[in-house]
Each structure stands twice: as structure tokens, then as C-alpha cells.
From Swiss-Prot:
Protein's name in the database: Nucleotide-binding protein Rpic_2826
UniProt record similarity statement: Belongs to the YajQ family.
Protein species of origin: Ralstonia pickettii (strain 12J)
HAMAP family: YajQ
Disulfide bonds: none
Pfam families associated with the record: DUF520
GO molecular function, one term: nucleotide binding
Alphabetical keyword list: Nucleotide-binding
Annotated signal sequence range: none
PANTHER family, A to Z: UPF0234 PROTEIN YAJQ
Function: Nucleotide-binding protein.
Cellular component GO terms, alphabetical: cytosol
Annotated InterPro entries: DUF520 (IPR007551), UPF0234-like_C (IPR035571), UPF0234_N (IPR035570), YajQ-like_sf (IPR036183)
Amino acid sequence: MPSFDVVCEANMVEVKNAVEQANKEISTRFDFKGSDSRVEHKEQELTLFADDDFKIEQVNDVLMNKLAKRNVDVRFLDYQDKQKIGGDKMKQVVKIKKGVSGDLAKKIVKTIKDSKIKVQASIQGDAVRVTGAKRDDLQSVIAMLRKEVSDTPLDFNNFRD
């Protein structure tokens, strides 16, 4: 029986490349000369460092631009509050969302069941497995989910025949 998984995860290689490009641009830009502005990437979070609130926003704009150019959906980013660190420096932590949350998984399953397409959807950890008798049914489910669930970036992988 054909099946696929609905997941929510960013391409971490592209995120890393975007962070490196953003840091390179920040180091060469005139308005950042003499400031300690940078973006750090650790596991599932990014940390923006800058001298003041305005420069944090500028660093964020550069990062967003680089992520968009590398086709990374910015809806994966979850911004935390800005924090003051030593002296006049500031930082902001940005968490990268991974996995389908419980509420979103229930919404996806309900949307699939309400569509009356002959497929079964089941929640498996941080993914939703969709199985059906025909490949065409699965493709119509993918198209329907892309249209219905637009507030969260969804990926479809592990497609099996």
C-alpha cells in the first residue's frame, strides 16, 4: 500500500549555509563596522548578536534575506525575546521548529478525514503517516494539505509504493 509521511523540518544544511552567508555579509557591511554583530548556529537554534535593538533587526533582515535565497521557509523560525547581555550588547534566540506538534497533527488528521478521500492518517511521533490504496489519492491529499494548512510549512517525505 502506498504511503508517505507529513513532517515539519527545515533543511539544516541550507540553514547552515544561509547563516554563513549572513555572517560574511555582516562582516563586510559598512553599517556593521566596529560592532560585534553576528549569527551563531547550534543544533536547532540560531542566536543573533548585536550592539543595540536596531542592529539586531538589521542582522535579522540579512538572515531572512539569505534564508529566502536558499529556499528555506521562514515560518520554521520561532523568535524568542531580545535579551541584554553585558554592557550595551543584545542577543536574540531564534528556535528552529522541528516535528509536527500534537495539535497540528490532530488538525491534519481531521482535515484528511473530512476530505472523504479514501486514505488513512495516523499520528506517529512527530510525523503523520498517510496510507492509501492508490497513488492518485495520496497526491490529492498532498495538494489538499498544501492548500488547507498554510500557517505551517509542511514537507512530505518517505513516499513508498
